Amino acid sequence: DVANIINNDERLKGRLKLVFIPNYSVSLAQLIIPAADISEQISLAGTEASGTSNMKFALNGALTLGTLDGANVEILDNVGEEHIFIFGNTVEQVNALRQKGYNPAEYYQQDEQLNRVIGALVAGKFSPEDPMRYTNLTQNLQYHDYYQSLADFRSYVDAQAKVDEKYKNRDKWIDSTIQNIINMGFFSSDRTIMEYADNIWKVKPLSTNK
């Protein structure tokens, strides 16, 4: 639905296209990951087990736009904050919001841009033939929003602006790309297995001398 709007907008012709690739697989990943400029890792802080896709993207030179969740935290530690785009609440802030009673409507009411986004969904802008298609989504966002998407919205938009700004500066973008590639050695299987052997399994290598 969103693709139909974007891809048929004459203002964006030749500049932007939205494509959904079904049945994502390793074979498709081998084509997509090396070609990516940005890797969006947008899970709510503290909710996702550490995956490896963000590492693969970074190793291939894509810059990460993500929350402080999973391996994003370690990527930040290794590449430095100037070579990654972090947004959203921390785990502590997420938990604090839950404890005091998270009210997504507050964010919806106070942020004009967010209000317009939700309003467009409610009005059926992306599905004029079925205006109620996204009712479950919009009601969940406004009245429940377990993953606190509305709380992170403004920070995400601001981070996207930083992406745009850096992308305009070819030298800075290339520098960040190189920094991501050369600092991904931390995620090597050799280092990981060595740390598991030392800190978890408590094993030592056997001597091969006879």
Please give the residue ranges for each predicted region.
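Short acidic loop-to-helix transition motifs that present clustered carboxylates
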Residues: 23-27, 46-49
